[in-house]
Amino acid sequence: VFLLSGALVAGNYEKAYTLLDALFYQREEPIAILGALATSYVDMVRVRAALENGGTYGDAAQYGDYKGKDFRLKKAQQNVRGVPQQVLRESLHLLLEADMALKGSRLEPRIILDELIAKLLLAARRERA
């Protein structure tokens, strides 16, 4: 899922959908996919905040349980390069909407996640245009 979040913030449609297809092929639970994606985006928000305040990615560890999970913050730092704060905020909002849809909608989970991926990609691309 770390690769998926990286593809999303980079605006890489093909890679994002290939990775999502692979996760569904492996029978990953949609709510688990969404949870892992949300975690990756929260990591990126925390790292972005630390960097904007003159710190390092490691400083973001004080905002969550990262003991033994330093790799998540390193990956978040790689993914967040060049991603505006507004994209991260919008992405968190989209993730929340998808979470509510997965938990309270009769739509197929795959449709909800496909729509989420499209919206996250559009958010990333719009800011780079």
Residue spans for each PLM region:
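Helix-rich C-terminal "collar"/helical-bundle subdomain used as an assembly and partner-interaction module
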Residues: 3, 9-129
